Amino acid sequence: MNRVKTFVQKIWTYDLVHTAVYSIVLELIVECFNRRGIMGLAFPFMHPIIFIYNTLIIMTSMALALFFRRRMFVYSVVSVFWIGLALTNFIILSSRKTPFTAMDFYLIKDAIKVAGLYVSVIQIILIALLVIAVIAGLVFLWRKAPKLEVTIKKTKFVAYAAVQMILVFLAAYGMGITLLFTGAVEGHFGNLAQAYKKYGFSHCFVSSVLDRGIKKSGDYSEEYMDSLKNDLDNVDVEASKKT
């Protein structure tokens, strides 16, 4: 028992171990929101490889804390960000079938206008109180959370953090490319709702950020559209003459 305790205490001295543990816990919370229940806790057992990949995505963002002395505060900010996205998805799925994606940010003005149709006044008040409580909690952490004692030069501290973050990013990127290449996950989703449950919230949401649909053609311009319209008008005129 003492050996196990000693081993745990030893590995806990490594920065990335902290980041990995917090990322695993955060990924489980996110998936519980994604699946609208505690079935999210079964995700690592149902799809272990994909769970690790989603955790690495979150861990890449959590690794930002390694650049700061107020690490608990930064870990908390990143956690609030991911939980906020997952909670938004949870709320959206209660009123529509398609999950929350990056494209929804482009529609935020329209969403605010029709928010009353999907969320009651009481729910809006509760959400506002929750936001205020979270902000207050973050301010408290900023002021009271302990700072990391740094015994090395700032340049070495930043370089060490950068190396660790790059390693995590390369692990996430490499695993993502491998899973996409082997077909274990997809980047384009036929059924968005099923994809979120099968491939995880983190992967699907990040995919919606990176891939926002069909790219604009190089030939696309106002002049080109005008010429295309004229061609279609000419076709309609010729067709009417024949009839």
State where each predicted segment sits.
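Soluble catalytic regions of membrane-associated enzymes that act on cell-envelope
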Residues: 179-243
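Transmembrane and membrane-interface helices of multi-pass
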Residues: 2-196
